[in-house]
Design a protein with these regions (language model features):
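Short, charged/polar connector segments at secondary-structure boundaries
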Residues: 1-78
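Short, charged recognition helix plus adjacent turn
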Residues: 81-82
Length: 82
């Protein structure tokens, strides 16, 4: 079973291809939900040297950024580079 961890948002790299799928209205809706209910679903990241690369959870990550958060809940996974 994976262990949920807290990651510094500044240490998470978002690949360019993944950034292209960003929907600002989804980010806004998630940010509102997170204000009321907290972060429900952790993101997925993989290690790449000294940083982490986002695997899943772009909108959750951006919602946390919009709320001024410095950390986010996530799981560290073993994933192939795309």
């Amino acid at each position: 079973m994976m262990k949920r961890e807290t990651f510094k948002i500044a240490d998470i790299y978002v690949p360019v291809k993944r950034r292209a799928t960003l929907n600002p209205s989804t980010v806004q809706q998630l940010a509102q939900d997170m204000l009321q209910n907290g972060q429900k679903s952790p993101i997925l990241v993989r290690r790449d040297g000294d940083r982490f690369v986002l695997v899943e959870g772009l909108h959750r990550l951006e919602a946390c950024k919009a709320l001024g958060e410095e950390t986010i809940l996530g799981y560290l996974v073993q994933a192939a580079k795309h």
